[in-house]
Amino acid sequence: MLIREITDVIERFAPLAWQESYDNAGLIVGRPDDEVRKALLAVDVTDEVMAEAEREGCDLIITHHPIVFHALKRFNSADQVQRCVERAIRSGIALYACHTNLDSAPEGMSWRLAEMLGVADLRVLQPSVADAKVGFGVVGELPGAVATVEFMRHIQRTLGVRVVRHSDIASPEVRRVAVCTGAGASMIGEARRAGADIYITADMKYNDFMTPDKALTVADIGHFESEYCAIQILFDILSKNLITFAVRKSESSRNPVNYLV
């Protein structure tokens, strides 16, 4: 199957036009008319993921994070990014990323995470100016009020999160939940204005936990943990629309952050 036939399916769900201006989603290594037989899905392209692709005969790796994000001036295997790009070219493995366009797509990243946690009646938290159905984050309702601490333990159990960093508990119970996968500290204000009892995101800094008037609880579940659902979203898109194309979920895609607890 041609790469363009595969990426066309993904981009019908999450068009590249929806990515942020700073992003580098799309085909990074390879040509649209290259023929591929099997895709590997991962959060990041790493040495381990490259080895798995070679071992399993995958000639296309589709990730959430683009391996080339900042401009590269040379390829001399000095770091993992350079090694993986060089290895992909030598091995004939194409690299494709579906990043902020998947974040902002309806039924995309935040939608999936919220649904996994039992949050319903979802709407976009920060709509795009061009299209109110597109944007970052979601806010919705739980079927009933849940103790705040118990809901955070529910997050741990459901997502396999080892550590939840959180602010002071603003309310003993939560009903309205805001979610933004990845780094979402900049949207605390939107979550507050949406009337959320708790805001679930990642990459929070020290001062981010000092929410004004303690109006809501903010919970940092980890960047990788919040975005691991990208693999399943991409798998669902491809397996539903390309039933004869082989797709594998990576067993080597792992969190680069380690915890000593």
What are these regions (language model features)?
Residues 1-261:
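Active-site catalytic microenvironments in core metabolic enzymes, especially phosphate/sugar-handling
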